[in-house]
Regions:
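Accessory alpha-helical DNA-binding modules that contact the DNA backbone or grooves
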Residues: 1-184
C-alpha cells in the first residue's frame, strides 16, 4: 500500500510478516529504545528463528528466563552462550523492566511516532495508565479524547491515526498489553 504523499510502498501485514516482526524487535532493543545489553540485531534474528526459546514479540524477551528454566535446551548450553553469558543477558533484561514512558512509546515502533513525538506524548500523559484509556476512547474519532489528542502541540492527525491503528483491539494491541504486564 502506498499512502498519499509517500514515495514508497509499504507492506500492511505488520507483525504477521516475519521480516517486519524482526525489524520491529530490533527497533525495540535498540539503544534509543529499551537498549538491552547483549541483545542486538544478530541475537534477535537467532532467537526469532529458535524453535526452543523463540522471541517473536517484545514480551518474549521478558519471559525468556522463565521459559529457559522450563526448557530442555538451556540457553547456557547453546553455541555462543555459556553460563555467564546467559546470566548476563537475563540480568540485563531484568534491569530494563523499568523504563521511561517516552522510551517505551518509542520502542513500540509505531509509524510516525519517533523520539520527539514519544517525548511529546509522554510529557502530555505522564504515564501509561493515563495514556491507554485516552487512546481507547479516542478510537471514536468524534470523541473529546480524539480532539484532545489531535490538539497536542506537535501531534497531528497523521500521528493520531497511527497511534489509533496500533492500539486497535487485535493482535498488536494484545501484544502491547502482554508486554506492559511484564514491566514495572
Amino acid at each position: 500500500v502506498r499512502d498519499e504523499g509517500d514515495a514508497v510502498i509499504r507492506c500492511t501485514a505488520g507483525i504477521n510478516c516475519p521480516a517486519q516482526a524482526i525489524e520491529k524487535l530490533k527497533h525495540f532493543v535498540s539503544r534509543k529504545a529499551f537498549d538491552i545489553e547483549g541483545l542486538g540485531g544478530k541475537q534477535i534474528e537467532l532467537f526469532f528463528a529458535d524453535g526452543a526459546l523463540p522471541i517473536k514479540e517484545p514480551v518474549d524477551i521478558f519471559t525468556l528466563e522463565f521459559r529457559d528454566q522450563n526448557s530442555f535446551t538451556k540457553l547456557k548450553d547453546r553455541h555462543g552462550f555459556g553460563k555467564k553469558s546467559a546470566e548476563n543477558l537475563f540480568d540485563a533484561i531484568e534491569k530494563k523492566k523499568t523504563i521511561e514512558f517516552s522510551r517505551f512509546l518509542f520502542s513500540l515502533g509505531i509509524r510516525h511516532v519517533g523520539e520527539n513525538v514519544s517525548k511529546l506524548l509522554a510529557r502530555h500523559f505522564i504515564k501509561w495508565s493515563k495514556f491507554i484509556p485516552s487512546i481507547s476512547l479516542a478510537q471514536n474519532r468524534e470523541s473529546q479524547e480524539y480532539f484532545d489528542l489531535v490538539s497536542i502541540d506537535g501531534i497531528g492527525i497523521t500521528v493520531v491515526n497511527s497511534l489509533l491503528s496500533a492500539f486497535e483491539i487485535g493482535k498488536e494491541r494484545n501484544s502491547i498489553e502482554k508486554l506492559v504486564g511484564h514491566l514495572d
